């Protein structure tokens, strides 16, 4: 049942494609005919050679006349094949040109729609506003960079010098190791107390 409701696919084969196919088929038939005539000419030449060898000169001459006629046909076949191939190339190139033209047409339509949405005046306005924004930001940057006076610069240098001096005035750490001796007062505290002895 699915086939009953399925949409019929559109054939992608164009009239130009059919024409190219027919031309190529005719070309292939001519090439087959050309191959057949070429083989026949080779056989007839060998046969004429044999007739001359057998002393049948008139028959050989008649056969060579036929061969000459077939060679002329072969030459015409070459020209026809060349014409067919040229026509195939022309049609295929014309198809490419048509696709290019269709692409250009679609592109032009989109450009027109874009131009309708955005006019030249709007573009100029946007560019002008963008330039104004850039100029405004530049002025802000200049104000920020030029806001420090000479006094401010001097105060910054003085503060930098003061911080440097603080680092220089810090006491140095002792370079020798500390001794393990107990201070004298601590030694006195640790002495044993004298004990009183009762008189006898």
Curated annotation (Swiss-Prot):
Its main location: membrane. It is a lipid-anchor. Keywords: Coiled coil, Endosome, Lipoprotein, Membrane, Myristate, Protein transport, Transport. The gene is chmp6-b. Residues 165-200 are annotated as: Disordered. It comes from Xenopus laevis (African clawed frog). A motif (Type-2 MIT-interacting motif) lies at residues 168-179. The keyword Transport applies. One of its GO terms (cellular component) is late endosome membrane. A lipid is attached at residue 2 (N-myristoyl glycine). It is found in: Endomembrane system; Late endosome membrane. Probable core component of the endosomal sorting required for transport complex III (ESCRT-III) which is involved in multivesicular bodies (MVBs) formation and sorting of endosomal cargo proteins into MVBs. MVBs contain intraluminal vesicles (ILVs) that are generated by invagination and scission from the limiting membrane of the endosome and mostly are delivered to lysosomes enabling degradation of membrane proteins, such as stimulated growth factor receptors, lysosomal enzymes and lipids. The lineage of its organism: Eukaryota, Metazoa, Chordata, Craniata, Vertebrata. One of its GO terms (biological process) is late endosome to vacuole transport via multivesicular body sorting pathway. It holds the Pfam family Snf7. This is Charged multivesicular body protein 6-B. Belongs to the SNF7 family. Residues 9-102 form a coiled coil. It comes from the Eukaryota. PANTHER family: CHARGED MULTIVESICULAR BODY PROTEIN, CHARGED MULTIVESICULAR BODY PROTEIN 6. The keyword Lipoprotein applies. Probable core component of the endosomal sorting required for transport complex III (ESCRT-III). ESCRT-III components are thought to multimerize to form a flat lattice on the perimeter membrane of the endosome.
């Amino acid at each position: 049942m699915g086939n009953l409701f399925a949409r019929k696919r559109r054939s992608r084969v164009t009239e130009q494609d059919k024409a190219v196919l027919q031309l190529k088929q005719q070309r292939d038939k001519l090439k087959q005919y050309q191959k057949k005539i070429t083989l026949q000419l080779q056989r007839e030449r060998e046969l004429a050679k044999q007739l001359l060898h057998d002393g049948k000169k008139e028959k050989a001459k008649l056969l060579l006349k036929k061969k000459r006629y077939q060679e002329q046909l072969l030459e015409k076949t070459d020209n026809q094949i060349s014409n067919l191939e040229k026509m195939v190339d022309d049609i295929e190139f014309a198809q490419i040109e048509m696709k290019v033209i269709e692409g250009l047409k679609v592109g032009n339509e989109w450009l027109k729609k874009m131009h309708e949405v955005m006019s030249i005046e709007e573009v100029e306005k946007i560019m002008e506003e963008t330039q104004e924004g850039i100029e405004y930001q530049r002025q802000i940057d200049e104000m920020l960079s030029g806001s420090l006076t000479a006094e401010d610069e001097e105060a910054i240098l003085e503060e930098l010098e003061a911080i440097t001096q603080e680092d220089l005035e810090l006491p140095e750490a002792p370079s020798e190791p500390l001794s393990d001796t107990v201070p004298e007062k601590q030694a006195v505290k640790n002495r044993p107390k004298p004990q009183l002895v009762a008189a006898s």
